């Protein structure tokens, strides 16, 4: 079966062609499974994908590299400990928190640990994200404690203000009373 037949090139309908105008919306209410290609003048009935394309896995991503499949190695606890020590060193070396993994260092770690450089880079990226989240949690906690202290101080000052205002009112009412008594006598 020839997929790119001359009838397709001439614009005629081909049962093995997936039109870019096909309506993939199954909830559109259009139950006749026709192509939206009517705008272009060509109308196709039910879409058929050739069995050969489905069986060969056409369009699926392949995990093969030069014909060989490479499986992602799971890191051992020793490798993880080594990476963690390396990450802690990186934190100490970069106090400004710009912990971008140097490509030379990445390759060195890759060779030492027997892992793919991409695995090293992803591990560092994930660890950096976790570290940043932890730093934000600590910062939030310290800010929350400071806020609680300031909030409590504000409440104490407001209570003191209320007491002082009441003392002023009492004092002024006493003075008015004394003035009234002096005026009456």
Swiss-Prot record:
GO CC terms, sorted: nucleus
Broad class of where this protein is predominantly found: nucleus
Annotated DNA-binding residue span(s): 76-135
Keyword Nucleus on entry: yes
Top-level lineage group: Eukaryota
Key words of the record: DNA-binding, Homeobox, Nucleus, Transcription, Transcription regulation
PROSITE patterns linked to this entry: HOMEOBOX_1, HOMEOBOX_2
Tissue-by-tissue expression: Expressed in siliques.
SMART domains, per database record: HOX (SM00389)
Subcellular locations according to the entry: Nucleus
Pfam families attached to this UniProt entry: Homeodomain (PF00046)
Gene Ontology molecular functions: DNA-binding transcription factor activity; DNA-binding transcription factor activity, RNA polymerase II-specific; transcription cis-regulatory region binding
Entry-linked InterPro entries: HD (IPR001356), HDZip_class_I_plant (IPR045224), Homeobox_CS (IPR017970), Homeodomain-like_sf (IPR009057), HTH_motif (IPR000047)
Residue numbers spanned by region Leucine-zipper: 136-164
Protein role: Probable transcription factor.
Family the entry assigns: Belongs to the HD-ZIP homeobox family. Class I subfamily.
Record protein name field: Homeobox-leucine zipper protein ATHB-22
Origin species: Arabidopsis thaliana (Mouse-ear cress)
Taxonomic path: Eukaryota, Viridiplantae, Streptophyta, Embryophyta, Tracheophyta
């Amino acid at each position: 079966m020839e997929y790119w037949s001359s009838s397709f090139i001439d614009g005629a309908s081909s049962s093995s062609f997936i039109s870019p105008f096909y309506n993939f919306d199954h909830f559109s209410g259009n139950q006749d499974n026709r192509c939206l290609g009517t705008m272009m003048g060509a109308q196709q009935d039910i879409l058929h994908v050739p069995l050969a394309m489905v069986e060969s896995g056409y369009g699926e991503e392949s995990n093969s590299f030069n014909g060989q499949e490479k499986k992602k190695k799971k890191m051992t606890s020793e490798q993880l400990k080594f990476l963690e020590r390396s990450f802690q060193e990186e934190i100490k070396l970069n106090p400004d928190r710009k912990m971008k993994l140097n490509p030379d260092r990445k390759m060195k770690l890759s060779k030492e640990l027997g892992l793919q450089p991409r695995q090293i880079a992803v591990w560092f990226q994930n660890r950096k994200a976790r570290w940043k989240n932890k730093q934000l949690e600590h910062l939030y906690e310290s800010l929350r404690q400071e806020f609680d202290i300031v909030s409590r101080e504000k409440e104490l000052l407001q209570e003191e203000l209320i007491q002082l205002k009441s003392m002023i009112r009492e004092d002024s009412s006493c003075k008015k009373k004394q003035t009234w008594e002096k005026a009456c006598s």
